[in-house]
A protein has these predicted regions:
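Hydrophobic core
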Residues: 13-18
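Sec-dependent signal peptide cleavage junction
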Residues: 19-26
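Active-site-proximal alpha/beta segments of enzymes that process anionic O-linked groups
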Residues: 26-29, 41-224, 230-237
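Short, hydrophobic/glycine-enriched beta-strand segments
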Residues: 30-37
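Metal-dependent active-site segment of extracytoplasmic phospho-/sulfohydrolases and closely related
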Residues: 33, 45, 245-246
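Active-site-proximal segments of metal-dependent phosphoesterases and phosphodiesterases across multiple
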Residues: 237-246
Length: 246
């Protein structure tokens, strides 16, 4: 199973590289951030194409993404977006959704702000938690807000959803990196990006063809794209069900 995930990631690197090769001839100054959550440098460099790119044209850097009052994925994402350590409420109070006619009205009623394409419907919980219990003075959504203040557009593609007892458990916490001060992201696709695959953890995986097409779709109108692969997270969560042969 791990080999299959690595193979899929290698395909993604090739696909994204093709987008760069096409686009860089015409314009500069855009960023695609690919999140390989729950993996490490050794795993990444086991992909020959990625190792080759790092050797020829890449760099390796270290960043402290420790959160405030604990260390977990959501705090790490939010700390990147805040530019400093941040604390957050439980996952059940983090609820990123793509805008619909119904939830746009609910979001505006609760925040007083105009919704964008992707919104944290429970952003007030996170704001209160970080302001009242935070120890470092970091402000949620500083990265996304800085982009917005400079007329730069962010998009988020992908999720780390899993299936538990037949029910979909949503995880779109990648948006904590990209959101503004009010939990909003300009554009993206966090809903329709996975496909069923019984050979993969939780019987779902990222649709890499869809991921490629969506990246191309949002690239022209975005300055920064945050891509959540999801499969590395799902594999790590599922590993206790596997053995050395799988």
């Amino acid at each position: 199973m791990k080999k299959k995930v690595v193979s899929l990631l290698a395909i993604l690197i090739i696909l994204v590289s093709s987008i760069f090769n096409i686009s860089f001839a015409n314009e500069k100054g855009k960023v695609i951030l690919i999140n390989l959550n729950r993996t490490n440098l050794e795993d990444m460099l086991s992909m020959s194409i990625l190792k080759d790119k790092v050797n020829k044209e890449g760099y390796i850097g270290l960043m402290n993404i420790r959160g405030d009052r604990g260390t977990d994925d959501k705090r790490s994402y939010a700390s990147i977006g805040a530019g400093g350590r941040i604390t957050l409420p439980d996952n059940k109070y983090i609820n990123f959704e793509e805008a619909t006619n119904a939830n746009k009205e609910a979001y505006k009623a609760e925040t007083g702000k105009t919704p964008k394409k992707i919104n944290d419907m429970s952003i007030n919980y996170s704001l209160v938690e970080s302001q009242e219990k935070g120890s470092y003075g970091s402000v949620l959504g500083s990265l996304g807000q800085t982009l917005a203040d400079n007329n730069l557009k962010a998009s988020v593609i992908g999720n780390s959803d899993i299936v538990v007892n037949g029910e979909l458990v949503k995880n779109r916490n990648i948006a904590l990196m990209a959101m503004d001060h009010f939990g909003r992201v300009d554009d993206g696709n966090i809903d329709n990006i996975n496909i069923k695959d019984n050979t993969m953890p939780y019987a779902i995986r990222t649709d890499y063809n869809k991921l490629k097409s969506e990246t191309k779709k949002f690239y022209d109108n975005s300055d920064v794209i945050f891509v959540e692969l999801g499969d590395t997270y799902r594999l790590d969560r599922y590993k206790s069900y596997l053995n050395e042969n799988t």
